[in-house]
Amino acid sequence: MSEAAVEKIEGYVASVLQSMDVELVDIQFRCEGHGWVLRLFIDVEGGVTLDLCAQVSREVGQYLDVEDVIEQAYHLEVSSPGVERPLKSLANFERFAGKKARIKLHEPLNGEKTFEGIIGPVEDGEVSLLVDGKIAVKCGIEQLNKARLVL
């Protein structure tokens, strides 16, 4: 599927979910053992329920069927991101301040790319990660390669 098709799907899904007060955490489209899978990871205050996943699946599935955005056969899966959910926005870091996270930077900082610690405050558009009570990393979201909560 083209990048434009993925962006079109992501834009539609995000607008539908926003009207439902649901966050689109991540979207994946990949070929797996049983064929192509479009996987949506959603989150909501209070947690994701099976009924919510089914509702999102119906709404998104109807749109994809009508618009015929995906050329090949695929399966649509909707689920929660799990306890080790990705952190992709400043709002995510604000929401989960005080929780344990692992971040990986695009470029090394003091010779290290990967850090694990407690999410600190978001200030001036920068996220911070505390290790042993001190700020170990303070950077813009664009400097992060990956970030996720950890147990």
UniProtKB/Swiss-Prot annotation:
Coiled coil: none annotated. The keyword Cytoplasm applies. Keywords: Cytoplasm, Ribosome biogenesis. One of its GO terms (cellular component) is cytosol. It is found in: Cytoplasm. One of its GO terms (biological process) is ribosomal small subunit assembly. InterPro entries: Ribosome_maturation_RimP (IPR003728), RimP_C (IPR028998), RimP_C_sf (IPR036847), RimP_N (IPR028989), RimP_N_sf (IPR035956). Disulfide bonds: none annotated. This is Ribosome maturation factor RimP. It comes from Desulfotalea psychrophila (strain LSv54 / DSM 12343). The lineage of its organism: Bacteria, Pseudomonadati, Thermodesulfobacteriota, Desulfobulbia, Desulfobulbales.
